[in-house]
Amino acid sequence: MNVLFLPQSGALGPSSRYRVYQLLPHLRAFTSEVSPAIDDDLYRAIYLTGHGSKLAALYATWKRRQADWRRVRDFDVVFVQKGFFPGLYAGLEAAMAAQRPLVFDFDDAIWLPREGGSPMLRALHRERAVQTILHRATAVIAGNDFLAEYARRFNANVTVVPSAVDVARYPRAAGSTVVGWIGSRTTLPYLKPLADVFRQLGITPRVIAAGTPDFPADFRPWRLETELDELAQLGIGLAPLPDMPWERGKCGVKILQYLACGIPVVASPVGVQRDLVRHGVNGFLAETPEQWRDCLKQLLDDAALRQRLGAAGRALVTERYDVSVAAARVAKVLAASAQTKGMTGKL
């Protein structure tokens, strides 16, 4: 079976890396071709350095996807990751779905305009465009139950495949007391409300990110080639999130990364984070500043507790959130979709 994978970006983009590229070695039963909408150079310019134009990304996506549309009949199944222009336009996906079975995968609440995003894109955002893709797809893969619940309003053939990590690649953390966070330029603001907690505890958090924080931090620039080594130096992982609709759709990859290294986590009880972090078992859930302070202090003061919670976290990820588990589920969806002759799962 021949599958055309259409990710949003090259492997430098985290969503495409976790939802497509890391699965490919585990999908060798399929003949596959990967056609990213934008390459790593353009992704780096726009999302890592902040010097590129998102209009350039839209233009590159349009050119690439028009070329892909002309050749979809050469494949048995088309796998679309997150859409070409989520919330803006769904015409190309609909045209592809009319020619070949189309599997649509998404790991964010893309039907919502993102807070803090481009004012122009927010103004142009149309939820109907996302609904059209969900309606036309042969099958939908959602990164968590919150996303799946929305998708099932428009398509009966929805499978939940949580985001996963390749546990074997993650080194075990050394057991330090370094309190740290890993994330993107756009998610750095999630960490800032904890500034007073850090000050009260005398902590300077280590921040591994593409953007520079505007609060006191031990900043380490994020690089794909050094990411795992940087993670392994942490002793406690942070995952604060505001309880908002967009954040409820997130898939908790940073928590999976911490746990894969055997690092205990303190996280906000928002969305999938409530499922990944088992309070007192592999980390702690904290809502108020007082809870954050108390949970962090407890972990900082007790090396045995950090070790016990970290071991439980790595065991959980190995059993339920390893890339091999996710790839097996995706393989079933692809195989079933190829047998549908282009039928959709629309309601």
Where are these regions (language model features)?
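N-terminal strand-loop element at the rim of the active site
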Residues: 5-73, 211-212
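C-terminal alpha-helical cap of glycosyltransferases
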Residues: 323-347
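Donor nucleotide-sugar binding/catalytic pocket of nucleotide-sugar-dependent glycosyltransferases
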Residues: 103, 110, 135-170
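A short, well-ordered alpha-helix in the C-terminal region of glycosyltransferases
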Residues: 298, 305-320, 326-329
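Nucleotide-sugar-dependent
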Residues: 186-189, 221-260, 267-275
